[in-house]
């Protein structure tokens, strides 16, 4: 199974993202994410068997125990890659705690022996892939600065359900002791 550690989003945040994505979809063609798939990835892991999932759970619990619940807030739209083949995303307001949480998860997974991709953590929620954008028009799509409390981290499985990509929660680890 393909797995990643992330933060699930509440309904208000999903609503705000869906509203922005719906407006973007009218302007920019692409493969848009399903509303229920919106999340913030802390660390992509990749293929994992049952034994690996046990190690991941231990790493998640250790990382989560170090942090009290905290808030995240939506920022504006932006993109990765080239405008003709972009990943459209909504950023999050910079949060040192969020960055530290992602780093803690990563360090514990590396210590447990996982091979992880290199790269700097960039907090975001993917709205579309293979989007054809006009970068100047992105600013015309407002994003309500919705926020939410982060109280847990989640291990998600990326799988197909009725031929649709879904991110299914496998386990949750509450923040704090």
Question: At which residue positions do the language-model features occur?
Answer:
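Histidine-dependent nucleotide/RNA phosphoesterase domain, centered on the 2H-phosphoesterase fold
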Residues: 1-177
């Amino acid at each position: 199974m393909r797995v990643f550690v992330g933060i699930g989003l509440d309904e208000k945040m999903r609503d705000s993202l869906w509203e922005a994505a719906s407006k973007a979809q009218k302007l920019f063609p692409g493969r848009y994410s399903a509303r229920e798939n919106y999340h913030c990835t802390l660390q992509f892991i990749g293929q994992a068997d049952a034994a690996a999932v046990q190690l991941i759970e231990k790493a998640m619990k250790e990382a989560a125990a170090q942090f009290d619940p905290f808030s995240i807030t939506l920022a504006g739209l932006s993109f990765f890659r080239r405008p003709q083949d972009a990943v459209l995303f909504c950023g999050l307001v910079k949060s040192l705690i969020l960055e530290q949480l992602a780093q803690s998860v990563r360090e514990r997974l590396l210590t447990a022996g996982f091979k992880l991709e290199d790269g700097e953590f960039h907090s975001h929620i993917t709205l579309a892939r293979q989007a054809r954008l006009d970068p100047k028009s992105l600013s015309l799509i407002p994003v309500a600065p919705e926020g939410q409390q982060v109280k847990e981290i989640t291990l998600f499985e990326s799988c197909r359900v009725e031929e649709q990509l879904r991110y299914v929660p496998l386990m949750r680890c509450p923040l704090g002791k």
